[in-house]
C-alpha cells in the first residue's frame, strides 16, 4: 500500500464564493471506485484577491488493488454540488500488488484463530 499527495491549483472569479475541489478515481470501465471532496470533508479552501488558490489532498494509505485507474479533478461550487470545471483523466495510475487479494480495494482487517 502506498501513500501519495495531489496538489490542485485553481483560478476563479474573485467575486464568487470560495469554491470546492474534488477528485474521483475510476477503473478502466469508467466506474468511480473512490472519491474525495473538500466540501464533503468540511474543508474550506483559501483563495487570494485575484481568485487563485490551491489545495493539496494527502493520501496516507491508498488501498487500491492491482489495476489501472484514472483520476479526474473537479472545481465545484461552494456547496460541492455543481462543477465549474473538471479535468478528465488528468492522472493515470498503474497499481501492482504482491498478494492474491481480489477486488478493487484492500479492506483493513484482522484474523483471529
Which positions does each model-derived feature cover?
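Localized sequence-composition bias
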Residues: 4-113
Amino acid at each position: 500500500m502506498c501513500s501519495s499527495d495531489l496538489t490542485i491549483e485553481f483560478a476563479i472569479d474573485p467575486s464568487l464564493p470560495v469554491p470546492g475541489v474534488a477528485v474521483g478515481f475510476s477503473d478502466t470501465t469508467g466506474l468511480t471506485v473512490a472519491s474525495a471532496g473538500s466540501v464533503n470533508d468540511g474543508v474550506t479552501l483559501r483563495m487570494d484577491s485575484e481568485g487563485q488558490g490551491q489545495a493539496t489532498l494527502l493520501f496516507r494509505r491508498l488501498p487500491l488493488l492491482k489495476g489501472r485507474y484514472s483520476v479526474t479533478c473537479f472545481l465545484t461550487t461552494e456547496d460541492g454540488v455543481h462543477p465549474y470545471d473538471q479535468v478528465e483523466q488528468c492522472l493515470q495510475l498503474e497499481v501492482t500488488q504482491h498478494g492474491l487479494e481480489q477486488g478493487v480495494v484492500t479492506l483493513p482487517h484482522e484474523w483471529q484463530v
